Amino acid sequence: MDTQDIVSEISELNLTYLMLAQQMLAKDRDAALFRLGISEELADILLTMSPAQIVKLASTNMLLCRFRFDDHAILGLVTQPHRDKGLQQSQMSILLARQAVEQIN
């Protein structure tokens, strides 16, 4: 895979992510804020963006979504076998909820 292919894939992923974020925010804002890990301010901006603005933002060569499993405890919950899937998901949700939301600086 060459550099141009990677940039194209990143743009496509960004577009999908932004469109999904808008849909999630429109359907259930509180759940979307939690699942996306974003602030109210960022949610407001995403909801007011036009399709043209979404496409323009998506075409950057930088990923707009980020890997939220910075904490080794969260990564361990995902990678280790667990007997009770419901308990595993609850523990992961609690750990993710403790993380700060993304802010616009």
UniProtKB/Swiss-Prot annotation:
Protein's GO biological process: bacterial-type flagellum assembly; positive regulation of DNA-templated transcription; regulation of bacterial-type flagellum assembly
Pfam families named among the record's database cross-references: FlhD
Cellular component, GO, one term: cytoplasm
GO molecular function annotation: DNA binding
InterPro entries cross-referenced by the UniProt entry: Flagellar_FlhD, FlhD_sf
Localization: Cytoplasm
Coiled coil: none
SUPFAM superfamilies: Flagellar transcriptional activator FlhD
Transcription regulation as UniProt keyword: yes
Keywords noted in UniProt: Activator, Bacterial flagellum biogenesis, Cytoplasm, Disulfide bond, DNA-binding, Plasmid, Transcription, Transcription regulation
Family note: Belongs to the FlhD family.
Biological role: Functions in complex with FlhC as a master transcriptional regulator that regulates transcription of several flagellar and non-flagellar operons by binding to their promoter region. Activates expression of class 2 flagellar genes, including fliA, which is a flagellum-specific sigma factor that turns on the class 3 genes. Also regulates genes whose products function in a variety of physiological pathways.
Domain characteristics, as noted in the entry: The C-terminal region contains a putative helix-turn-helix (HTH) motif, suggesting that this region may bind DNA.
Assembly: Homodimer; disulfide-linked. Forms a heterohexamer composed of two FlhC and four FlhD subunits. Each FlhC binds a FlhD dimer, forming a heterotrimer, and a hexamer assembles by dimerization of two heterotrimers.
Name the record gives this protein: Flagellar transcriptional regulator FlhD
Organism name: Ralstonia nicotianae (strain ATCC BAA-1114 / GMI1000) (Ralstonia solanacearum)
